[in-house]
Amino acid sequence: MPEVIELEFHSKDVSEFQLRRLVRASVRKYTVPVTAFISDAFIADDTCVGVSFDHSEKDDAYHRADGSILHTGKIQSARKEGRFWLLETQDGNYVIASFRRDLGRASFLKLLQSADRF
């Protein structure tokens, strides 16, 4: 029987494509515990910014609720697990479910290229 996945949207509409990617990312098993899944991701100053889903550190005031904007700590490593990128940062492990349409993938590729120089 399929597992039921509940998403609460508080501040961002999500396209069908993004929703499918979030569901696929969330049912996969990862080698480390995942802090949150990120949609509409882009890279800025060696950090990832995007829309957070299924964050492990929700509180009573709904901080970090599904659909809220997330800004990670500095990215320490990035690796592909299955079809998704896993980011290890100062404050947790994040899975990129989808990139922001206009600059997301390009900013991520720039981060990967800058890491290759070292």
Segments (PLM) and residue ranges:
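Feature for intrinsically disordered/low-complexity regulatory segments and propeptides
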Residues: 3-50, 54-60
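Generic N-terminal initiation segments characterized by hydrophobic and/or small/turn-forming residues
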Residues: 4-6, 16-19, 67, 100, ...
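Short, conserved turn/kink motifs that form compact alpha/beta structural patches or helix kinks used as
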Residues: 52-82
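Short, compact, well-ordered microdomains
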Residues: 72-118
